[in-house]
Each structure stands twice: as structure tokens, then as C-alpha cells.
Amino acid sequence: MTAFFKTLRNHWKKTTAGLCLLTWGGHWLYGKHCDNLLRRAACQEAQVFGNQLIPPNAQVKKATVFLNPAACKGKARTLFEKNAAPILHLSGMDVTVVKTDYEGQAKKLLELMESTDVIIVAGGDGTLQEVVTGVLRRTDEATFSKIPIGFIPLGQTSSLSHTLFAESGNKVQHITDATLAIVKGETVPLDVLQIKGEKEQPVYAMTGLRWGSFRDAGVKVSKYWYLGPLKTKAAHFFSTLQEWPQTHQASISYTGPRERPPIEPEETPPRPSLYRRILRRLASFWAQPQDASSREVSPEVWKDVQLSTIELSITTRNTQLDLMSKEDFMNICIEPDTVSKGDFIIIGSKKVRDPGLRAAGTECLQASHCTLVLPEGTEGSFSIDSEEYEAMPVEVKLLPRKLRFFCDPRKREQMLPSTSQ
């Protein structure tokens, strides 16, 4: 034993390196063990739903999964098959997985797809936007859009995951929680933005549209990968050297928020008795007729704004969902063009992690419908749900509570008012 410790002391560099390697290996193995425990617990919970009996005349629920294998730098397929697929199969659903091969394929497939009970998106913001656009471009979108949508966050950017699921630093737990939310069946309504250019078909967004210098610098961050943790600040610093001040000129016309109509019951109420129907007919017959002027809807008031901004964003409220709001609107945020170079680098670096961050002095407008007009010859690009589109004049319309998404029951309870209040 003495000789053993003497050898360790004489070769202390190798001993130190070996201990570090052993510690790292133990930590890695422990993490894998914890991930397996999470998967097992999620599968056991899903199996409870799969073991439930269904009526003889009922059919097994069909789920169609749109999987983007290229998401998360090509790791999405492995993440889905290890963490999500077993849960879906154990839940008793008839699962069909559609793997997309190229950008825009999900959009085309959805325009032709037959009806299903559940649509599941396994990918990031780009895949989700394709699926939503494909659903809402269908000729029968009024009925097809009622199909609930599940979102399994596998991409590098998954903006809605913070709204729909509990926060988790563990990737495996985040994916299993999202998949279990689909199995449990709790849903929340989310707004959609319809963005229409002059010629092309409309594009639909769950998060919003960004146009400006912060966005342009953010997409160049990967170009400076060799700078490691400094790459984000470097992208914004070099952006200030190209042109300064960076301003974007445009004009925008918009209408204000609209009152939210009462929520319609999902189940059809029972037909009233014959006696009640007769009384209702008599009451409507003897009721005073309304004047035509009282039935007229007041015309919408449009407001015009000329803007000079460093960045413009038009966003839904899905990232800060309020189920009890009495108004429906989208946010138009006009950030000031007086931002200094230092603030541009600091704020821009934070915006890469949190696109909802705003510079001091930002003007926010509430609108239900707007048109954005750009000066002739304007170059650059929009980001619509993290996907790049050519900058052009667009019409943006809010479709309030258009789609229903599966949500973690714990998150849904937090959005509703407490019964004790």
C-alpha cells in the first residue's frame, strides 16, 4: 500500500489527470442514469393512459408527427426516438411519423393531408411555422384548424416551450414533459399572425415578425464561432463598424384592440323543452324591433405612424399568455434610433437569448390589424418565427385564439385566476 501511494506521489501529474477524468466520467454516467430514470417514469405515466378501456364503438386516436431530423444540429431524430416516441406509443395512440427531407415540405404535406385527431410538431420554431402555415392555407381550414396541436421542442429555438411547459434545465425532462402534455390532453388557445405580402400566399406566425439591426446582427453570430463566448458581442461590434447610426424608415397604419367575445362552450347545450321554445318564439315575436342604426357596427379607426427605428417587431402575446384578457391585440414595438454603440452591443447580445427584450424608450402600440409600408428600394430581411424572409410591404392581421395547443396542466393552472380570489 505504501508503494502504491508513493507511486501516486511520484507521478502526481498523471494522478491529477486521472482523477479529473474519473470524476468527469462518473458525473457523465450519473447524468445518463438520471435521464434513464426520467424516461422510465414518463413511460410508466403514459402507460396508465394506454391501459384505459375505450368504448366498443370508439376508434383509437390517430396522431400524425411531423419530425424535422435536421433540427438541433441533426440530433432531433435521436432525441425524438429516445425520449418522445416510446411515450406516444405507450399512451395508446396510433402514431404516424412523417420525416421532412427539405425546407417547406411539411407545409406542402399538410395542405394535402387527410384528417387526423392530433397533429404533433417535433422540431423548432421553423418546423412549427411550416406546420401552422400548412394548416391555415387549407381550403377547409375552418374545420381543420380545430385539430389540437402538440409541440415537442427539439430545435435550437423553441419560443413557445416556455409558455406551454414548465421550465427545466434538463433536455430529457423538457422533452418528456412536452410529450406527456400531449397524452394528458389539456389545451390552451393561442393567437396567430397572418402576414401577407403583395404577391405571395400568406405566412402564419406564432411568435411574430422582426425587422431591424438587432435582428441582422443576431443572424451573423454563427459566423464568428471561432471566438467562442465572445462571438455574440463580436457580431454586434462589427455591425456598428459597417454603418452607424443604423436606422430603418417605414410607415405603419393600424387599428386598435378588439373586444374579446365570450368563450363558446365546447359541448352543445341540450335542446330546450317544447314549452320553453314556444315562450321564446312568442317573446321574440312581441319584442320591439331594433333600429337599423343601432345594429350598425362602428367603422374601424385607422391610425398612421411614420417611424424611424433601429428595430421594429410585431408580436403576439403567446409568450406572455393571458387567458382572462378582455381584449385581443398584437404588440407593435418601435425601438428608438438613438441607441448608442455600447448599448447596441449590450442589448443585442441579450436579445440573442431573449428576443422579447426591448431597449429603453421603446414605443409599444396595441393593434388588431396593421399594414407596414417600406420605402421603395429597401433591402434586408424579416425574421418571421426565426425564419428569414425578404423585406417587403406586408399586411399583418391578428387571428385571436385561432389554434389550440397541448399544454402542461400545471402551466394552465397558473394562467387561470385562483378560485380563492
From Swiss-Prot:
Annotated metabolic or biological route of this protein: Lipid metabolism; glycerolipid metabolism
Family annotation (InterPro entries): AGK_C, ATP-NAD_kinase_N, Diacylglycerol_kinase_cat_dom, Lipid_Phosphate_FormReg, NAD/diacylglycerol_kinase_sf
Cofactor needs: Mg(2+)
GO biological process: ceramide biosynthetic process; glycerolipid metabolic process; lipid phosphorylation; protein insertion into mitochondrial inner membrane
Keywords annotated in UniProt: Acetylation, ATP-binding, Kinase, Lipid metabolism, Membrane, Mitochondrion, Mitochondrion inner membrane, Nucleotide-binding, Transferase
Domain (DAGKc): residue spans on this chain: 58-199
Single GO MF descriptor: ATP-dependent diacylglycerol kinase activity
Main location: mitochondrion
Catalytic activity line of the entry: a monoacylglycerol + ATP = a monoacyl-sn-glycero-3-phosphate + ADP + H(+); a 1,2-diacyl-sn-glycerol + ATP = a 1,2-diacyl-sn-glycero-3-phosphate + ADP + H(+); an N-acylsphing-4-enine + ATP = an N-acylsphing-4-enine 1-phosphate + ADP + H(+); 1,2-di-(9Z-octadecenoyl)-sn-glycerol + ATP = 1,2-di-(9Z-octadecenoyl)-sn-glycero-3-phosphate + ADP + H(+)
Notes on how activity is controlled: Both the ceramide and diacylglycerol kinase activities are inhibited by sphingosine and stimulated by cardiolipin. Both activities are stimulated by calcium when magnesium concentrations are low but inhibited by calcium when magnesium concentrations are high.
Family note: Belongs to the AGK family.
Quaternary structure annotation from Swiss-Prot or TrEMBL: Component of the TIM22 complex, which core is composed of TIMM22, associated with TIMM10 (TIMM10A and/or TIMM10B), TIMM9, AGK and TIMM29. Interacts with SMIM26.
Function recorded in the entry: Lipid kinase that can phosphorylate both monoacylglycerol and diacylglycerol to form lysophosphatidic acid (LPA) and phosphatidic acid (PA), respectively. Phosphorylates ceramide but not sphingosine. Phosphorylates 1,2-dioleoylglycerol more rapidly than 2,3-dioleoylglycerol. Independently of its lipid kinase activity, acts as a component of the TIM22 complex. The TIM22 complex mediates the import and insertion of multi-pass transmembrane proteins into the mitochondrial inner membrane by forming a twin-pore translocase that uses the membrane potential as the external driving force.
Protein name (record): Acylglycerol kinase, mitochondrial
Origin species: Mus musculus
Upper lineage: Eukaryota, Metazoa, Chordata, Craniata, Vertebrata
